[in-house]
């Protein structure tokens, strides 16, 4: 078990020993303030792209629903006729092969799982690199007519100047003990929210969209979203037409036992969703961006296995590689027939689209009020 896993589990348990790390958090806070100010006053150089940049990020460690939000925004902008591209650092990919454009053929172990998911879902122009300036350069070289760039998870990357900032906050999870890393799971202080549009991610049936003790002094306008689960899909469909591997299976029924396997930032949300859908969930949380193996997944083959869309990207790549290597045994084929994906769609409030329209109009990008 690595140190990241130990601390993450301690956050979840609200372990008392975390307060021993408070001096480290104070030092981290000081460094964050100095770093941000250095970019503001020009001591550290920053880059302004030739077209507007919209940053989507969060101030907490772990998943907040950022990727589904980006997918929803890209789809909306595409349907309004806006030429939009996306950049990302490509976490989980191979930085030695970056900067790189992301296509539907890109392997997740090269460009990262989230970029693959975004491009496979939307078909948008996208580039990845830890150096955001290089990512923008290669993106605009390939797509010179882009009007807007969305930067995935670039909130703390102050080397990139931005025109719009949207921060996603998980209203149910909140901010824990409200301490910065490593005592708590905040990347930046809660006061950082004053400088950005805050999108409160809440449950569809939540009676309150946010924890007032955390947020009531910060905003006068609340933008909200929730994740709507779609129908279960076979992870590997017969449409792949590869090596005549046609998988036909019945979706697990409500009340049946399922293995929920998840390597995302906040897996509990995924488990809670499956429970709410009526499944008897056997949870298997893994670290974010975890690299699964087919052998590892075999241990769960006694029941249907349900994964997230992000994990499905990597698992499909494993299956494809096994087929190419002619290593897809009968045992693996049986496993493939038990693998299911639960896609989710980010549903945004009207105020999100209204705010987006207003912000883009100030950048001379015309967008209608029509929501998706």
From Swiss-Prot:
Belongs to the LpxK family. Pathway: Glycolipid biosynthesis; lipid IV(A) biosynthesis; lipid IV(A) from (3R)-3-hydroxytetradecanoyl-[acyl-carrier-protein] and UDP-N-acetyl-alpha-D-glucosamine: step 6/6. Transfers the gamma-phosphate of ATP to the 4'-position of a tetraacyldisaccharide 1-phosphate intermediate (termed DS-1-P) to form tetraacyldisaccharide 1,4'-bis-phosphate (lipid IVA). It comes from the Bacteria. The gene is lpxK. Pfam families: LpxK (PF02606). It catalyses: a lipid A disaccharide + ATP = a lipid IVA + ADP + H(+). This is Tetraacyldisaccharide 4'-kinase. Keywords: ATP-binding, Kinase, Lipid A biosynthesis, Lipid biosynthesis, Lipid metabolism, Nucleotide-binding, Transferase.
């Amino acid at each position: 078990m690595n140190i990241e896993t130990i601390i993450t589990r301690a956050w979840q348990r609200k372990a008392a020993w975390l307060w021993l790390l408070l001096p480290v958090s104070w030092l981290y806070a000081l460094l964050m303030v100095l770093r941000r100010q250095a970019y503001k006053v020009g001591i550290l150089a920053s880059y302004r792209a030739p077209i507007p940049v919209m940053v989507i990020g969060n101030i907490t460690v772990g998943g907040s629903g950022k990727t589904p939000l980006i997918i929803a925004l890209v789809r909306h902008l595409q349907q309004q006729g806006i030429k939009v591209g996306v950049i990302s650092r490509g976490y989980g990919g191979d930085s030695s092969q970056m900067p790189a454009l992301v296509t539907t053929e890109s392997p997740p172990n090269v460009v990262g799982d989230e970029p693959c998911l975004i491009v496979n879902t939307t078909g948008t122009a996208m580039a990845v690199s830890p150096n955001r300036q290089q990512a923008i350069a290669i993106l605009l070289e390939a797509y010179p007519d882009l009007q807007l760039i969305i930067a995935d998870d670039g909130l703390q990357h102050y080397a990139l100047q931005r025109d719009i900032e949207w921060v996603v906050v998980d209203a149910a999870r909140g901010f824990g003990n409200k301490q910065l890393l490593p005592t708590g799971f905040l990347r930046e202080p809660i006061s950082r929210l004053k400088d950005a549009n805050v999108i409160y991610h809440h449950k569809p049936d939540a009676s309150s969209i946010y924890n007032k003790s955390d947020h009531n002094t910060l905003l006068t306008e609340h933008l909200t979203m929730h994740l709507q689960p779609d129908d279960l899909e076979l992870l590997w469909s017969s449409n792949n037409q590869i090596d005549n591997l046609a998988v036909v299976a019945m979706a697990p029924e409500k009340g049946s036992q399922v293995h929920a396997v998840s390597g995302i930032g906040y897996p509990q949300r995924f488990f809670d969703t499956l429970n709410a859908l009526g499944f008897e969930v056997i949870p298997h949380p893994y670290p974010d961006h975890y690299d699964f193996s087919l052998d590892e997944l075999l241990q769960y083959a006694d029941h249907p296995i349900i994964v997230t869309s992000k994990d499905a990207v990597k698992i499909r790549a494993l299956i494809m590689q096994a087929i190419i290597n002619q290593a897809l045994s009968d045992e693996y084929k049986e496993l493939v027939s038990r693998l299911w994906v639960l896609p989710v769609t980010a549903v945004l409030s009207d105020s999100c689209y209204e705010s987006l329209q207003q912000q883009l109009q100030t950048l001379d990008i015309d967008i209608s009020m029509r929501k998706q």
